Curated annotation (Swiss-Prot):
Transmembrane segments: none annotated. Keywords: Ribonucleoprotein, Ribosomal protein, RNA-binding, rRNA-binding. GO terms for biological process: translation. GO terms for cellular component: cytosol; small ribosomal subunit. One of its GO terms (molecular function) is structural constituent of ribosome. The lineage of its organism: Bacteria, Pseudomonadati, Pseudomonadota, Gammaproteobacteria, Cardiobacteriales. This is Small ribosomal subunit protein bS20.
Length: 88
C-alpha cells in the first residue's frame, strides 16, 4: 500500500486514466464490430459510415497514446481493404 500522499495521488490518477482508456478501447472495438457486421451484410452505406467513425476513433486513440500509431494504421488498412473488396 502507498505510504505517501504523492503515491496515493498517483494511484488515483492511474485508476482514472485506466478507466478512461478502457472505455475508449471498448468504443473502438464496438464500432469495428459494427463495421464488420455491415461488411458481412454487404451494406455499403453503413460500412462507409462505420469505417469513417472507426478511422476517426483510431486516429484519436493513437494520438493520445491509448493504442500504438502503427496498430491504428494497420487496423485502418485492413478495414479499408475489406471495404474496397465489398465495393469492387
Amino acid at each position: 500500500m502507498a505510504n505517501t500522499a504523492q503515491a496515493l495521488k498517483r494511484i488515483r490518477q492511474t485508476n482514472k486514466a485506466r478507466a478512461q482508456n478502457a472505455s475508449q478501447r471498448s468504443t473502438i472495438r464496438t464500432v469495428m464490430k459494427k463495421f464488420l457486421k455491415a461488411i458481412e451484410a454487404k451494406d455499403i452505406a453503413t460500412a462507409e459510415q462505420e469505417f469513417s467513425t472507426a478511422a476517426s476513433l483510431l486516429d484519436r486513440a493513437a494520438q493520445k497514446h491509448i493504442i500504438h500509431k502503427n496498430k491504428a494504421s494497420r487496423l485502418k488498412s485492413r478495414m479499408h481493404a475489406k471495404k474496397k473488396a465489398l465495393v469492387a
